[in-house]
A protein has these predicted regions:
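Local sequence-structure signature of Cys/Sec-based thiol-disulfide redox active-site neighborhoods
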Residues: 1-33
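Thiol/selenol-based redox catalytic cores and closely related redox-interacting motifs
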Residues: 34-126
Length: 126
């Protein structure tokens, strides 16, 4: 199951949802405004550098020693549409920020990827 936090770009969201549906992958869609403090902390724990799924504008806070984590999280959750790189997928304790169709392929099961590869190579050799 993939948790997908949607962006404001409805066309991009629909492309991703269609992609997952075509491959029979279950997706649980969420609005980023539904994100809780606990969920954000959980996602941060999945990443070696939580700034990879946050807006580049927040990089200025990366080396600040005087900013408490709780204050930083509150700042992110005040306006998550601008501070989190959307659409964002969470699957198997991994975070995939700013997801597009090419990157979505990484979320396909291995056997599905192998079938796609075999179909493409067979098609090319015919």
């Amino acid at each position: 199951m993939i948790d997908l936090y949607l962006s404001k770009n409805s066309q991009r969201n629909q492309l991703l949802l269609d992609f997952f549906q075509n491959y029979g992958i279950k997706v649980s869609c969420h609005s980023v405004s539904e994100m809780t403090k606990d969920k954000l902390i959980e996602m941060m724990s999945y990443s070696s550098d939580c700034f990879e799924f946050l807006s580049p504008n927040l990089l200025r806070f990366k080396n600040r020693d005087n900013l408490r984590l709780t204050d930083f999280i509150e700042m992110i959750l005040k306006n998550p549409e601008l501070t989190i790189r959307l659409p964002l997928a969470v699957s198997n304790k991994r975070v995939y920020p700013n997801l597009n169709l090419e990157e979505a392929r990484a979320l396909l099961p291995r056997d599905t990827k192998q079938l796609i590869y075999m179909e493409q190579t067979h098609y090319l050799s015919s």
